[in-house]
């Protein structure tokens, strides 16, 4: 199931760098991670849903690109973000 508005607001509030920050790489990666984790549960039940799997792969690739960007811009922020989200890289 998709993220609710309350879930999105909580993630944005936790990872925002400023008050109305919704576009920083940290926020975008955190939102993508929540959606990816949600879809992983969906695929445990619906193994043959290849259409949604394509969307999942697209999200994973987008998250990887954002993490690569953040790593190049500010390695300290990158390390703290992957530590907070529990990502292995």
Swiss-Prot record:
Alphabetic keyword roster: Ribonucleoprotein, Ribosomal protein, RNA-binding, rRNA-binding
Gene3D superfamilies reported for this sequence: 6.10.250.3130, S15/NS1, RNA-binding
SMART domains for this protein: Ribosomal_S15
Pfam families attached to this UniProt entry: Ribosomal_S15
Entry's Gene Ontology BP terms: translation
Highest taxon, organism lineage: Bacteria
GO molecular function, one term: rRNA binding
One cellular-component annotation, GO: cytosolic small ribosomal subunit
Family that this chain belongs to: Belongs to the universal ribosomal protein uS15 family.
Subunit structure: Part of the 30S ribosomal subunit. Forms a bridge to the 50S subunit in the 70S ribosome, contacting the 23S rRNA.
Functional description taken from the UniProt entry: One of the primary rRNA binding proteins, it binds directly to 16S rRNA where it helps nucleate assembly of the platform of the 30S subunit by binding and bridging several RNA helices of the 16S rRNA. Forms an intersubunit bridge (bridge B4) with the 23S rRNA of the 50S subunit in the ribosome.
Official protein name in the record: Small ribosomal subunit protein uS15
Organism of this sequence: Acinetobacter baylyi (strain ATCC 33305 / BD413 / ADP1)
Taxonomic classification: Bacteria, Pseudomonadati, Pseudomonadota, Gammaproteobacteria, Moraxellales
UniProt gene name: rpsO
